[in-house]
Every structure is written in C-alpha cells, then in structure tokens.
C-alpha cells in the first residue's frame, strides 16, 4: 500500500521555485501536515546558474518559491548549501567528465544534497520528512519497510533519479505528486486554482549550474582550456580534431568535426573517449550495441539480492526499460546482461534495476561489452 501517516508530520518542503514543488508543498499542507518551505541556495554566485524558464536555483527561483510559500501560508527559509553542492555535485561532474565518463548531476544532487545534506539538517531540527515535487511513490510494505516505486503516471516517472536512495532515506521522503494520474496540464491547473503564480512557469531543463548551456566551454574553463586532440575511426585512422575529449559522451553525434563523410555515407557516433590519449573514437551506430555491463558502487532500496535475478533496467532518466539478468559479485560489483542489445550506454551513467514498478537498487556503470559485428563488404 502507499505510505500513509496516522498523524500529522513536521515536513520540510524543498521548493525549487517551480510548479511541481509548489503543488507538492500545498498538497502536504492540505493533508494536515505542519509544513515549512525551504529553498536551497546552491551557488555563491547565483548568476552562474540558469535563469528564467530554464533554471531551478537562481535568485528569481528563490523569489518564486517564497511567493508560493506565502500563498500556501507556510513559513519559508533559504538555506545556503552552496559549498556542499560545489563539492559533491559540481566537482564530481567535472571529475567524471575529465575521466571520460558521463555523470548525471541531478541524480547526484538527490543523493548528496536533497536526501543527505538537506535531510540530515531537517532531522536534526526535528522534522519528520522532506517533501519534494518528484514523481515517484514510497510504499509501505507488509514487513514495515519502505519501497520506492514508479509514479502512477509512467510518462512523468522520476524514480530513476531517486534510485540511489536507501530505505532509511525513503522512510523520511514524501512525494505528494507520485500517486495521482494527473497530467502536467492538470498540475498547472491545480496550481492556478490555488493562486500559485508559478502555474505557467515553464519546466527547468539541462544542467542548472551551467548558465549558458555550454557544457564543453564550462569544462574547458574548469580543466584549463581546450586541448586539441584527434578524432579517430575504429581502425585508428585520423578523421578530424576536437578541442577537448572531456566534453564528449558515448553515443554523441553532434559536434564531431570530421573532415569528410564516412565511406559508407552513414553518420558517425562517439564510441570511445580516451582522456589519457586525448582521443575520441567514432563509428557507425551499430557499433554502439551493448550486450552486458559491469557497474560499481551499488546502492539498494532494501535488502540486496542474494543471487542472480531477472529484472528490467533503466539507463537514462528518460530512457526505456530493458530486460536483463543481474548478479551482485562480492557485494561491490553488479554484472548485468541484456536480453537484447541496447545502444548508447556510457560509463558514469546509472543503471537502475526494477522488479515490476519497485526500484531494487542502482549502480554506476564502469565498463560495457559491445556486441560482436560481422564484417561485410566485398
């Protein structure tokens, strides 16, 4: 059954300044909980964050959150977590790209900020739970444990970016939007009925701490400027140059400066990134097919699996599901084999395992196994 409370709780509502978190806070207050709103200041220089429609952590967003709290009728505070965010999210993002991996900063923010730094402070101040506008569901199992499940509306489900949470964190998590089969237009209509000015505010997208959306430029600035290197084909032949291998991700097609079309006339995609050699290897789309992967740093939403099992896996925040078999090795590595090959799997991404709608756990992809290709031509 869905997690319910027999008594009003002291709830700290994380309010980003967007419509989802505002409606979530309003629903929590309407349910009878003692709600306090908080906006997280995540940068010593808010101008470095995206502003307007595409932001989530700017001065403008803080003002929107405060206005929403005033309408709801709850106390509101701004908490400075800029240094923690810099260390745990921004620096991690830079280090992962420098190593040739593809991080997910939103997932890391949930793990290290919203349900660690924020939750720890909330519990220390006597709050019972942290409420957010995520679309996911916490379920109270028959044995009394908490389980994380997909949202009722799969189209809006955000359980992937919450797959790093453990049972202790889930016991203090509240997701008021996850249970309802409401469209985003209906959420906006509800916000408008409640008098919330953010009702028509567009959703945030992209990476909040890169103000202009230029990930390559951001990384070049942090890592000492562009360093020209070679773009190679699978045989090692030079096809072109790049301005820094650290800005690419597996499966990328755009931004490849290749001097001439491939012999087969087909587009080329990033297959491999070598920070040591500062090279990027490209190839045809079928070369991206992955049959298995090994993932590290597993985190479980409950008891770890005791042996091999069959699950569905999700590899990206908005990706589809894949049938897999998975086995935990020595408690530290997760070996995952796909029933059918999948494309564009990048080290650094999270693989999240599901048993039906229930999140089993997640781990960080370390290595992949590509499908063998049969040579053709004559």
Curated annotation (Swiss-Prot):
Q: What is its EC number?
A: 2.8.1.13
Site Interaction with tRNA: list residues.
134, 349
* Superkingdom as given in the UniProt entry: Bacteria
Q: Which InterPro entries match?
A: MnmA-like, MnmA-like_C, MnmA-like_central, MnmA-like_central_sf, Rossmann-like_a/b/a_fold
In the UniProt entry, which residues are flagged as the active site?
109 (nucleophile), 208 (cysteine persulfide intermediate)
Q: Please give the SUPFAM superfamilies that the UniProt record associates with this protein.
A: Adenine nucleotide alpha hydrolases-like (SSF52402)
List where in the cell it is found. Cytoplasm
What's in the keyword line of the UniProt record? ATP-binding, Cytoplasm, Disulfide bond, Nucleotide-binding, RNA-binding, Transferase, tRNA processing, tRNA-binding
The SS bond pairs are 109-208
GO CC entries: cytoplasm
| Top EC category | transferase
Gene Ontology terms: biological process: tRNA wobble position uridine thiolation
Q: Which reaction does it catalyse?
A: S-sulfanyl-L-cysteinyl-[protein] + uridine(34) in tRNA + AH2 + ATP = 2-thiouridine(34) in tRNA + L-cysteinyl-[protein] + A + AMP + diphosphate + H(+)
Question: Which portions of the sequence form the region Interaction with tRNA?
Answer: 156-158
Q: Name one GO molecular function term.
A: ATP binding
Determine if tRNA processing is one of this entry's keywords.
yes
Q: What does this protein do?
A: Catalyzes the 2-thiolation of uridine at the wobble position (U34) of tRNA, leading to the formation of s(2)U34.
Name the family.
Belongs to the MnmA/TRMU family.
Q: What is this protein called?
A: tRNA-specific 2-thiouridylase MnmA
